[in-house]
Swiss-Prot record:
It comes from Nitrosomonas europaea (strain ATCC 19718 / CIP 103999 / KCTC 2705 / NBRC 14298). This is Dual-action ribosomal maturation protein DarP. Member of a network of 50S ribosomal subunit biogenesis factors which assembles along the 30S-50S interface, preventing incorrect 23S rRNA structures from forming. Promotes peptidyl transferase center (PTC) maturation. Keywords: Cytoplasm, Ribosome biogenesis, RNA-binding, rRNA-binding. CDD domains: YjgA-like. It is found in: Cytoplasm. Residues 1-14 have a biased composition (Polar residues).
Length: 178
């Protein structure tokens, strides 16, 4: 008997199977919810309260912080993932991303302050550029701090004026609001 003797059977797609997601997709979604739950566990209790989560989920998140055993923590995170199914993850994810973005913006501002401080100390022409960029600067106070920093370095004293310069820059250079 040859292959051509048998009619080819083409399986008809099951209409029910097309409407429901695959097991793989469901597992991926569950892992994503569990990962989101892990991020929530790392938050401070005040931040968790800001999210308006169901009480049972909020309690589970706070309890997870206390669990030290690896296996118990893993099971508890799976439980949190299960509880997360009842919550719309999009607003929670957006809030977490906004908090993270705010922290990154603040860090960038602090780095900008540090770069200005280092330039002002190492380059005498940076003072003129700084005053042009930030015209409301008290130039006399700035130059006094820079002179005192040099004196502290030569005397081997603690960097009091170094810190004072940073505080002055914090007052002068505005942090970009989010």
């Amino acid at each position: 008997m040859t292959v051509s003797d048998h009619p080819q059977t083409v399986s008809q797609p099951d209409p029910e199977s097309e409407s429901r997601p695959s097991k793989t997709r469901l597992k991926q979604e569950m892992h994503a919810l569990q990962a989101l739950g892990e991020r929530l566990v790392e938050l401070e209790p005040a931040r968790i309260a800001e999210l308006d989560l169901p009480e049972k989920l909020a309690e589970a998140l706070l309890e997870a912080r206390k669990i030290t055993s690896h296996g118990a923590r893993r099971r508890h995170l799976q439980f949190i993932g299960k509880l997360m199914r009842a919550v719309d993850p999009l607003p929670v994810q957006e809030k977490l991303d906004a908090w993270q973005h705010t922290g990154m913006r603040h860090t960038a501002w602090l780095h900008q302050l540090e770069r200005w401080r280092d330039r002002l100390i190492s380059d005498e022409t940076a003072v003129t550029e700084f005053v042009q960029t930030y015209p409301h600067t008290d130039v006399r106070q700035l130059r006094t701090l820079l002179r005192n920093i040099e004196k502290e370095k030569l005397a081997g004293k603690p960097p009091h004026n170094f810190r004072a310069l940073f505080q002055l820059l914090r007052q002068i250079i505005p942090e970009i609001p989010g």
